[in-house]
């Protein structure tokens, strides 16, 4: 398997780690403040890397507008929706829903980039979607019996389930469309880290404006006042930004530029599988059988897409 396509798996591992780190930090920061700090930190790191290594070139600026649009869709809108969904649904169910960005990417790549789909690839995408449905409907213990008291907080739903599902699916669409928009610049030879820096920087600017003008005065009641946040809180969010955005997103952007968009994003969709043992260790609760079955379908679909693409 080409290393460019394996980048999807590396991104998935990074996002799994950041998903497990996120719920506690979101609880303390509040979703919008959490995402603003996270993206600003990631943007600053990427900017420093690009300036030191002189990665900004003419090719990047030729595609600047479309890359910035990619950042608005994938980072500002997509990432905000993603971590809002994590807060509402927990990391496991959000990860499973977010896996739909793989078939979305394949469909968008077919529609707008001419990346052809075979019947076998469509079948494999269908397996991913079936896995998502199974994991959502049967993915937590006692889901059919209605007993919720024994559930870990990460498996409980905050607010309406339908809103959480729509947020996660919106995040998946934002990720898929953002990756699609960044590909022309990468194909023309723009540096992947520079593309990632411009995307994340655009998202950071939009988040700072949105937070400063509106959300700063609308923190959730359970969020910790800024003066009470500790250095460990900021160290945690810096680590999360580095793992999930600086490393994970940059690797994914590089893969998108060197391989089929759908294949890379489908491999990045194995987060629901990677997260299961992490949740078992973190929460002390073994995931339900439906979670494992759904995850198996997701992995099988991803593997078949790779198989059918060569």
Language model: regions and residue ranges:
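Glycine-/small-residue-enriched transmembrane alpha-helix faces in small-molecule transporters
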Residues: 1-33, 44, 151-194, 310
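Loop-to-transmembrane-helix transition segments
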Residues: 3-11, 47-50, 57-81, 98, ...
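Loop-to-transmembrane alpha-helix entry segments
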Residues: 57-62, 98, 105, 111-149, ...
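Hydrophobic/small/kink-forming positions within alpha-helical transmembrane segments
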Residues: 16, 47, 71-76, 103-107, ...
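Transmembrane alpha-helices of multi-pass small-molecule transport proteins
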Residues: 11-21, 26-77, 127-134, 195-221, ...
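Structural motif at transmembrane-helix junctions in multi-pass transporters
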Residues: 27-33, 80-97, 187-194, 250-270
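Hydrophobic core positions of alpha-helical segments in small-molecule transporters
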Residues: 10, 37-38, 97-100, 119-123, ...
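Membrane-interface helix-cap regions at the ends of transmembrane helices
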Residues: 42-60, 111, 133-154, 184, ...
């Amino acid at each position: 398997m080409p290393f460019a396509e394996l980048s999807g798996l590396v991104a998935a591992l990074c996002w799994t780690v950041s998903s497990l780190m996120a719920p506690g930090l979101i609880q303390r920061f509040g979703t919008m403040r959490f995402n603003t700090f996270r993206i600003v930190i990631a943007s600053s790191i990427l900017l420093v890397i690009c300036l030191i290594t002189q990665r900004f070139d003419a090719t990047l600026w030729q595609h600047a507008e479309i890359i910035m649009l990619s950042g608005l869709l994938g980072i500002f809108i997509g990432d905000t929706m993603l971590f809002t969904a994590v807060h509402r649904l927990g990391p496991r169910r959000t990860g499973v829903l977010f896996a739909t960005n793989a078939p979305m990417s394949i469909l968008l790549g077919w529609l707008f980039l001419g990346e052809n789909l075979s019947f076998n690839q469509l079948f494999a995408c269908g397996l991913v979607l079936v896995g998502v449905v199974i994991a959502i409907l049967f993915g937590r213990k006692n889901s059919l019996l209605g007993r919720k008291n024994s559930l870990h907080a990460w498996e409980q739903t905050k607010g309406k389930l339908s809103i959480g599902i729509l947020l996660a699916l919106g995040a998946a669409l934002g990720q898929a469309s953002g990756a699609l928009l960044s590909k022309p610049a990468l194909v023309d030879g723009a540096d992947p880290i520079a593309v990632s820096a411009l995307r994340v920087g655009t998202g950071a600017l939009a988040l700072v404006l949105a937070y400063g003008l509106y959300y700063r005065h609308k923190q959730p009641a359970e969020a910790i006042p800024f003066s009470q946040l500790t250095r460990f809180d900021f160290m945690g969010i810096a680590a999360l930004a580095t793992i999930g955005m600086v490393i994970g997103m940059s690797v994914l952007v590089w893969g998108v530029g060197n391989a089929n968009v759908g294949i890379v994003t489908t491999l990045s969709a194995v987060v629901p599988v990677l997260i299961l043992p992490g949740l078992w260790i973190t929460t002390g609760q073994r995931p339900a059988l439906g979670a494992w079955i759904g995850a198996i379908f997701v992995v099988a679909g991803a593997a078949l897409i790779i198989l059918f693409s060569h």
